C-alpha cells in the first residue's frame, strides 16, 4: 500500500508484503483517524492455476495514520486466508468485523471487540462457493 501526504505528488510504500499480495480493503476509525485497518490478499494467477489465498493474506492495523503497520491475527484461521472484507461498527469503533474467505472449516465472519487484539468466529459462511463477494 502506498501513502501520500502531499495530495498525491509523492508516494511511499508503507505496507509491502510480497509481489503476490496487495491491499484489498482499508477502513478508518471515525473516532480516531490515526487508526486504520487494512486487509491484504495474496493471490497468484497464471495459465496453469489460480491460487485464491496464501500466507500474505491477513489484517493489519496502523495507529499512526498509516506510517507503520502491524498484523492483528490472534484468533484468525492459521491456514492460508483468501480475500478479506473489513468493517468497523458505526456504534463502537473497538468492534470490527472481518469476512474471511478460506476453506469451509475456517472461513466465515470474525469479530473483535478489542480493536483487533483478538478475534472470535461468529459465522461459518461468507458467501457462495464461486469466489469472493464482498
Give short role names for the model-derived ranges.
Residues 1-134:
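Beta-propeller blade termini and top-face loops
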